[in-house]
Amino acid sequence: MGSRSRTPSPSGKRRHHKSKHKKRSKSHHDHERPSTRTDRDKSSEVNNHGRHRERDRDRERDRHRSDRHTERDYRHSPSILKSRKRSSSSSSDSQYSEQESQRSKQKRSRFKKLDEQNQMQVERLAEMERQRRAKELEQKTIEEEAAKRIEMLVKKRVEEELEKRRDEIEQEVNRRVETAKAEMEREMMLELERRREQIREEERRREEDEKQKREELEEILAENNRKIEEAQRKLAEERLAIIEEQRLMDEERQRMRKEQEKRVKEEQKVILGKNNSRPKLSFSLKPGAL
């Protein structure tokens, strides 16, 4: 019994397989849009049927558990143990094997029915999915055909309208061309005027720069002339000072010469006054001697 409780039962495997199938079906239906109201009704009916079958399986599983607990309690109860001790081992083994065989047959029959129901459910879902995809493909084909027809009708209508309004369109195109041409001419005239104004402005700036440079040169020349005149004036003053100094030196030389002559004469007078026997001596100095 312990080993049987640890191994997964076939019903548990089927429930696990069914839950995986239901999850895949649910995620698949979440990502795809139902095409018609009939598909939604069928899917809801299938879901209700699946929930009823799930409840039936839960009831069957609970009943099976209760039978197992009852059997275990029956086998482990003191009175039964005492009676079994009193009974023969062969009879108890045969009864137990018969009960187990009956239970296994019942389980196999139930599992077979569940497998058949699951297979039918899978086939039904596959058929519903096939029908839904066929409807989606048909709807897509219809939409594509309708889009092509609409495109052809629109193209034909546009061509007819263009043919009807060809003269009007040509006049409108010519008008726009003339308008664009006039606008381009106006922009070109404005650009030419702007360039002329720019050239005049550059010429005026160049004249102002030349005038400013000329004035600066004139100022530099005036300053140089003033410096030259100042230098010439200083040079003339220096020359006058040198001439004046030369004149003063000449006057001083004349004065010294006269004083020398006067002193010589006085000395001669003194000498002649002491010695009257000597004749007078005359001394004269040449102008170039000093």
From Swiss-Prot:
Transmembrane segments: none annotated. It is found in: Nucleus; Nucleus speckle. Residues 29-44, 53-76, 124-137, 249-269 have a biased composition (Basic and acidic residues). Residues 1-10 have a biased composition (Polar residues). It comes from the Eukaryota. The modification Phosphoserine is found at S77, S79. Residues 88-99 have a biased composition (Low complexity). One of its GO terms (molecular function) is pre-mRNA binding. GO terms for biological process: mRNA processing; RNA splicing. Induction: Post-transcriptionally regulated by autoregulatory feedback loop. Splicing is regulated by a stable intronic sequence RNA (sisRNA) resulting from premature cleavage of the pre-mRNA at a cryptic polyadenylation site within intron 2. Premature cleavage is inhibited by the U1-snRNP complex by telescripting. Arglu1 protein stimulates premature cleavage of its own pre-mRNA by binding and inhibiting the activity of the U1-snRNP complex. The keyword Phosphoprotein applies. Post-transcriptional regulator of gene expression; modulates splicing and premature cleavage at cryptic polyadenylation sites of its own pre-mRNA through binding and regulation of the U1-snRNP complex. Associates with the U1-snRNP complex; the interaction is enhanced by binding of Arglu1 to a stable intronic sequence RNA (sisRNA) produced from the Arglu1 gene by premature cleavage. Belongs to the ARGLU1 family. This is Arginine and glutamate-rich protein 1. It comes from Drosophila melanogaster. The lineage of its organism: Eukaryota, Metazoa, Ecdysozoa, Arthropoda, Hexapoda. The gene is Arglu1.
